[in-house]
UniProtKB/Swiss-Prot annotation:
Protein name: Aquaporin-1
Cross-referenced Gene3D superfamilies: Glycerol uptake facilitator protein
Residue ranges annotated as motif NPA 2: 230-232
Organism: Saccharomyces cerevisiae (strain Lalvin EC1118 / Prise de mousse)
Record-level Gene Ontology MF annotations: water channel activity
């Protein structure tokens, strides 16, 4: 082998293996399919504290606003006509209060801790490996403490009874309430997984569909269960009202089962690798649009290339018209 060939081989080997040892070479990592929003950094004590502070502030802000709005709605005179809290005006006001409160709270604290603000959502994120189990426990503690703090603050700042605690209504049984809470939470958690965890161009807008999903859940469930879908919300309100019904467990088991159900649906989509289908559909659509744009350009190119001929013909016709017109 010549010296030049030897040098080329050494250079190629250096490019592929900077260490010069084949066994120690580590290939580049594959790109992540999950969004980095919830992975603020490694699980150090400092970073756990940052996540805990972000979840506490975000959950407190979300639930305090929602509790106060809910209290105002339930103190309305319409409560006399609809003692179960099923008056449409109350339902819409409560749903808007919770939906918009979680929306702006997520937008504020998504860059700090991810903005889960809900133990059920945190469980879905942990199952999806968007956060570690340790981080999930830290978030749970912060969210539950923030829920109790928000309930106490809302109760202390507003006069009258505490009317934002969860309870069954319209003759809803515990079993029905459990399944309603489970499916309502599943819708919320699946929205989080599909809009915030999946890597998309619209991740920065994830707070909007999450808020809308919580709004829809409240419109659907409030008359029947009071809409928990968040154990921190249910516990904080129960502590503030000093009201723990014998069926309080459905506001914990239901949301946790819902978060597992949402993760199961999301995991099934990952196994089916739905992104390849979506990518193929987008590629086909882009190709079709490109072909449609090219077709109108063909007559234009013909006119441009034959402009001189067309000009000569039109000039001849014009002269003939003028000559015959004079005759």
């Amino acid at each position: 082998m010549s010296s030049n060939d030897s040098n080329d081989t050494d250079k190629q080997h250096t490019r592929l293996d900077p260490t010069g040892v084949d066994d120690a070479y580590i290939p580049p990592e594959q790109p992540e399919t999950k969004h980095h929003r919830f992975k603020i950094s490694k699980d150090t004590l400092r970073n756990h504290f940052i996540a805990a502070a972000g979840e506490f502030c975000g959950t407190f802000m979300f639930l305090w606003c929602a509790y106060v709005i809910c209290n105002v709605a339930n103190h309305d005179v319409a409560l006399v006509a609809a003692p179960d809290g099923s008056h449409p005006g109350q339902l819409i006001m409560i749903a808007i209060g919770f939906g918009f409160s979680v929306m702006f709270s997520i937008w504020c604290f998504a860059g700090v801790s991810g903005g889960a603000l809900n133990p059920a959502v945190s469980l879905s994120l942990c199952l999806a490996r968007a956060v570690s189990p340790t981080r999930c426990v830290v978030m749970w503690v912060s969210q539950i403490v923030a829920g109790m703090a928000a309930g106490g603050a809302a109760s202390a700042m507003t006069p009258g009874e505490v009317l934002f605690a969860n309870s069954l209504g319209l003759g809803c049984s515990r079993t029905r309430g459990l399944f309603l809470e489970m499916f309502g939470t599943a819708i919320l958690c699946l929205t989080v997984l599909m809009t915030a965890v999946e890597k998309r161009e619209t991740n920065f807008m994830a707070a909007l569909p999450i808020g809308i999903s919580l709004f829809i859940a409240h419109v659907a469930l409030t008359a029947y269960t009071g809409t928990g879908v968040n154990p921190a919300r249910s516990l904080g309100a129960a502590v503030a009202a000093r009201y723990f019904p014998h069926y309080h467990w459905i506001y914990w088991i239901g949301p946790l089962l819902g978060s597992i159900l949402a993760w199961s649906v999301w995991q099934l989509l990952q196994i089916l690798d739905y992104t390849t289908y979506v990518t193929a559909e987008k590629a086909a659509s882009t190709k079709e649009k490109a072909q449609k744009k090219v077709k109108p350009a063909v007559p234009l190119l013909w006119l441009k290339s034959n402009f001189s001929l067309l000009f000569f013909i039109s000039r001849s016709l014009a002269l003939n018209v003028i000559i015959f017109g004079k005759n």
